[in-house]
Amino acid sequence: MIQPQSVGAVVPQRAHFAEPLPLRSGDALPEYELLYETYGELNAARSNAVLVCHALSGSHHVAGHYADDPGNIGWWDNLVGPGKPLDTRKFFVIGVNNLGGCHGTTGPASINPASGKPWGADFPFVTVEDWVAAQARLADRLGIERFAAVVGGSLGGMQALSWTLQYPERIGHAVLVASAPRLTAQNIAFNEVARQAILSDPDFHGGHYYEHGVVPARGLKLARMLGHITYLSDDAMADKFGRTLRHGKAVYSYDVEFEIESYLRYQGDKFAGFFDANTYLLTTKALDYFDPAFEHGGILRAALARASADFLVVSFSTDWRFSPARSREIVYSLLHNRRNVSYAEIESDAGHDSFLLDDAHYHELLAAYFDRIEV
């Protein structure tokens, strides 16, 4: 058996689309570009393609590294590659940066052809359904009529679910990890607090901060700090940080004293250094809006009747952001429609971020599922 290996050095590719893309909001993008990466080789039948959809802070860079930046490892590198659960000896894997993103795909920092200036806050709202429509156009460009599977964790899982509804004939399997059919009110509340942190930053300038040569780093930092709290479980925080004081005793100040404070500030500063605030706003709104049951009277099983793919749904025991109950809601609705669905709840103390980690049980489960997919 081959030892798991990296896909090695990878090169992003760019696809330009001159045809306008109609959006769910009623608006349209006149033209746009998608940045993507591929791993493995497309077979002669063009039947082994797998699309990996990213979550809020992810990108097209799913696996491997860049020759000029070897430390920049793909966000799901532990899952994708030769001998890994999503084995690139068998599958042709594609990662795409979503519309509105900040990693090379057309987004708020891109130039608005109508004004010659960055889009900023004028960039149209995009939804999960819009992302999937753009991904389908990329598949057309690559000559892929049908994906063997569409895979995603968290928000990526929502995209995989939407694929089964928007293009049921173009997807064989959907793998939804740590995901949900819609956000709870609590999740929408977290997103709103994060957005307000950005919107209230004096450097936000109504979303047109590019023209002022500044970024709303303070607001974006606070938004990320809040997000990180929800990505971790109470047990994970206790095990990793506890109540440890950096100086061994209280110094009675508002500066960093507890290790958890140091961690959150570090994560916030790091995120604010590379992510775009307008992209954060757009992406959290896309999360909030996603609800395939809305047009079916709130009845999920009615919404999922259109799906024909086989499903693997995975949740994690301590994930309270996208709890196992939300995954089971998807499973029950699929079973109601007599669809083929496998479900697993993985014991993990890492919370929502478990879907990114190299957990043996989790990876064995995914490997077994992908192994039985016929291409």
Curated annotation (Swiss-Prot):
Cysteine disulfide links: none
GO biological process, one term: homoserine metabolic process
E.C. designation(s): 2.3.1.46
Location in the cell: Cytoplasm
Domain AB hydrolase-1: 48-358
SUPFAM superfamilies cross-referenced by the UniProt entry: alpha/beta-Hydrolases
Keyword Magnesium among UniProt keywords: no
Coarse class of the protein's main subcellular location: cytoplasm
Residue numbers marked as site, Important for acyl-CoA specificity: R321
Residues passing through the membrane, by range: none
Active site: S154, D319, H352
Keyword rRNA-binding: no
Pfam family, any one: Abhydrolase_1
GO molecular function: homoserine O-acetyltransferase activity; homoserine O-succinyltransferase activity
GO CC terms: cytoplasm
Pathway(s) served: Amino-acid biosynthesis; L-methionine biosynthesis via de novo pathway; O-succinyl-L-homoserine from L-homoserine: step 1/1
Record's keyword terms, sorted: Acyltransferase, Amino-acid biosynthesis, Cytoplasm, Methionine biosynthesis, Transferase
Catalysed reactions listed for this entry: L-homoserine + succinyl-CoA = O-succinyl-L-homoserine + CoA
Family of this protein: Belongs to the AB hydrolase superfamily. MetX family.
Function: Transfers a succinyl group from succinyl-CoA to L-homoserine, forming succinyl-L-homoserine.
Quaternary structure, from the entry: Homodimer.
Protein name: Homoserine O-succinyltransferase
Gene name in the database record: metXS
